[in-house]
Amino acid sequence: MEKNDLIDFLIKIEELTKSGLKYSTDPYAIDNYRQLEEQVKKLLEKDDIVLEGENLFTRDVYPTPNVSVRTVIFSEDRKSVLLVKERMDALWSLPGGWAEMDLNPSESAKKEVYEEAGCDCRITRLVGVLDRYNDVKTTGVPEYVICFEAEKVGQFHEPCFEILERKYFPLDSLPKFSRKNREDQMRRLIKAALEGETVFD
């Protein structure tokens, strides 16, 4: 394996490990993630792996917002929007999640649609970039939400385990949104997509 390929591989493992340690509640899985983290550290200590400057494996990096992606997919008549039901609270979201380290924003959005909505899509345009905590006081990590509009491609397949179901909802009868989203922002993004606008904070 080329050295650069090894570094890319370790970055991906580190990304998965950090995500697992943050979100997993299974003690066996948590233990496995910690062991993986230790193995990555041991490999990074090898003399032939040199990481220059700030990188994913260092802790003292400049604090910066997290980035998530969301995608608006309308029905063919543009009277309904595709939403997914989150297992965590049995409420609804636009397909989406955290942006991936090794993908650009639109690729991350397509990946989330594939996993959560269970379909391929073609990204058609940028709808907006919003600050999730804009005008809200919080001690949490800031989050920027990048939203795209897309067209569904092909047939549906089974969504990932995080999703209970997917469904098109009429635009005048949207359900309650999951607590992982701000409902006012999700509605703003859907409206902007429908009207061909671009919104931002």
Please place each PLM-identified region on the residue numbering.
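Conserved Nudix-box catalytic region and its N-terminal flanking loop in Nudix hydrolases
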Residues: 77-115
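Unchanged
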Residues: 99-123, 131-188, 200
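Nudix hydrolase/Nudix homology domain
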Residues: 1-33, 91, 161-201
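Acidic, metal-coordinating catalytic segment for phosphate/diphosphate chemistry
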Residues: 27-70
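Long alpha-helical scaffolds
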Residues: 17, 37-40, 117
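N-terminal strand-loop-strand
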Residues: 53-93, 121, 125
